[in-house]
Regions:
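Nucleic acid-binding interface residues in structured DNA/RNA-binding domains
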Residues: 2-114
């Protein structure tokens, strides 16, 4: 299977980082939510690739970005560290990888659409 690359995507790393900066402790968003908020609903994978290159994960809290199914997703310091960071912010888990009350702690960014 050949995948076409959409060369029209104009998502800049800085735009992704700026959006993540508004996610408060104790809340999460998804790769898809970030892509939607930036006007590119099919760019969730691109968002993940941008976050892999996050030069300052302490300042830009990319640990607050999870998969759309409520699972952790990747993190440059490993899933266990991502889970521990989220737990210190009040996020709870069903097991090692699934967020409890995912819909309650998720921010979808529609509050900025007005």
């Amino acid at each position: 299977m050949v995948h076409k690359i959409d060369r029209s995507l104009q998502i800049k790393d800085r735009d992704v980082y700026d959006l993540i900066l508004v996610i408060p402790p104790g809340k999460v968003s998804t790769y898809g939510d970030i892509a939607n908020a930036l006007g590119h609903p099919k760019a969730a994978r691109l968002i993940g690739n941008i976050l892999k290159k996050n030069p300052n994960p302490i300042h830009v809290p990319c640990h607050r970005i999870v998969k759309s199914n409520g699972k952790l997703g990747g993190y440059m310091y490993g899933k266990q560290m991502k889970k521990e960071l989220l737990e210190t912010e009040g996020i709870r888990f069903h097991d090692c990888d699934n967020l409890r009350d995912f819909d309650k702690c998720r921010i979808g960014f529609n509050m900025w659409d007005a």
